[in-house]
A protein has these predicted regions:
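Ser/Thr/Gly-rich flexible loops in soluble cytosolic domains mediating phosphotransfer, phosphorylation
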Residues: 107-138
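Short, intrinsically disordered, mixed-charge
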Residues: 33, 37-40, 65, 69, ...
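A short, hydrophobic beta-strand/beta-hairpin element that forms part of a small beta-sheet core
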Residues: 94-111
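Globin-like tetrapyrrole-binding proteins
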Residues: 80, 84, 91, 95-97
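Short, intrinsically disordered low-complexity segments
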Residues: 48-77, 85-86
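N-terminal leader/targeting and pre-domain segments
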Residues: 2-5, 10-12, 28, 76, ...
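Local sequence-structure signature of Cys/Sec-based thiol-disulfide redox active-site neighborhoods
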Residues: 10-59
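N-terminal/domain-start segments enriched in small and hydrophobic, helix-friendly residues
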Residues: 16, 93-95, 133
Length: 138
């Protein structure tokens, strides 16, 4: 899925990609998002990339596994009401997005909502975005 030539050069030393959904977690948050999405008033491009209507996409699970096992990059997915203070400071008002947490704990924006929208719900397109961005950061 990810081009070996680029990521084989990436020295992450424990970096984490933190995906922030534009939805709250929990029963009320999930139902609210589902109903809003159904009638067209709620949108979360990261949700479309990571999940089918029922569960996490198999291709996304494979992508997570590849990042971790081959490149040492963890993926953490959080809802808006589940963010740490540092994650909130880096992403508030910019959801959905993907943050990059460096091994020293610092966090920066990695992919914004415009870039996530460009992936059009495709795990493969998202993987290409991540690959190209990692080659810049590391």
């Amino acid at each position: 899925m990810l081009e070996q030539s680029v990521l084989s050069r990436v020295q992450t030393n424990g970096a984490t990609l933190i995906g922030v959904y534009k939805a709250d977690g929990g029963i009320i948050g999930e139902v609210s998002y589902f109903l809003g999405h159904l009638i067209g008033v709620r949108e979360c491009n990261l949700c479309d990339i990571t999940h089918s209507p029922i569960k996490k996409k198999a291709k996304f699970k494979e992508f997570e596994k590849t990042l971790l096992e081959e490149h040492g990059i963890r993926v953490k997915l959080v809802h808006m009401n589940e963010r740490t203070d540092a994650e909130l400071a880096a992403s508030e008002g910019r959801e959905p997005c993907v943050l990059l947490q460096y091994p020293d704990g610092s966090i920066s924006m990695f992919l914004d909502y415009v870039e996530l929208k460009a992936a059009s719900g495709s795990v493969s397109s998202f993987a290409r975005l991540v690959e190209s961005r990692l080659s810049i950061y590391f």
